Amino acid sequence: MACETERTPLGVFKCQLCALTAPYSYQGRQPPDSQSVVLLEESYVMRDPFTPDKGRFLVVGSRCSMCGRLVCVGPECSLFYSKRFCLPCVQDNVDAFPQEIQQDLEKRKVPFTRPASQRSS
């Protein structure tokens, strides 16, 4: 039987764009019970509820590296390109991202508007 502290979340993560909420059990770059994993960003992490393996976890979200919003990892809310960016910041700075990222954004279901200076005539 798991001890009480393993079941008690540290808090509840809430995405500031889609309002997804999820309890998180760790915040940081190296989740407990996963010795070989170091995340590339400070993340909100929950234990994987689908497996009894304590070393398995799910990354719920992180802060946007530009504006600081809490955003989930869902493709409608953020993307990771060396750092986490919320989609509003990506859209405001789209020309700072590589062409591949811009093409990926155009394929997403989220309405994406290219700046007038980059629209094809």
Swiss-Prot record:
Origin species: Bos taurus
Protein's gene: CDPF1
Protein name: Cysteine-rich DPF motif domain-containing protein 1
Pfam families xref list: C6_DPF
Top-rank lineage group of the source organism: Eukaryota
Family to which the UniProt record says this protein belongs: Belongs to the CDPF1 family.
